[in-house]
Amino acid sequence: MMKSSRRSFLLNPLSMLLTGLLLGIAARLFDIYFQNLGEIFSQMAIWILLGTLIAIYSPTKKAAMGNIFPFCMGMLVTYYVTAAITHGVYGQSFIIGWTVFALVSPIMAYFAWMAKEPGAFSKIIATGIVAVSVVSSVLLFDRLRLYDFIIDGALIYILFFKKIKRSQKRKDWNE
C-alpha cells in the first residue's frame, strides 16, 4: 500500500471517530488502572500533540477540520460514558472545558495545518501551539512535569524540524 493511500485510509473522519472512541475509553481506564498513564492522558498537552499530528498529516485544511472534530467528540463521549459506568468522579467544569475544546477543535486544526506551510505566519502559529501547550500545563495542572517536556519537545520537533510532504495537487472538495 502506498504511503499516501495508507495515510488517507488512516486519516478520514470515520477512522478518526473510531480512534477517538477507543482513546476515550483507554484514557478513562488509564485513570483507574494505570495512574501514570492516566495522569498523562488527563493533560491538555497530549491532546494538543495528537490533534496537531492529525491536523498536519491531513492532506488539506478542510480534511484537518473534518478529521479532528469526530476524533475529539468520540474521545469526549466515550471518556464520560466510561466514567459514568465506572462510577468515576468528575466535575462539571471539566466536562464543559473539554466540550468547548472539542467544539473549537476544527478551528484549531485549521491553524495547526497551516503551521506546516511556508512563511513567517506559519512559524507564529507553530510557536502559539507550543506556547498554549506549555501554558496549559502550568495554568491548568500547576506545573510542567517530565512528560510535559517530552510532549512539548515532540511538538517542537514536529512543528519546526520534521518535513511533511504535501501533495501540490489537491481536490477542491477537500481544501
Regions found by a protein language model. Give the residues of each.
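Aromatic-anchored segments of alpha-helical transmembrane domains
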Residues: G20-R28, C72-T82, I129-L140
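N-terminal topogenic module of multi-pass integral membrane proteins
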Residues: M1-I68
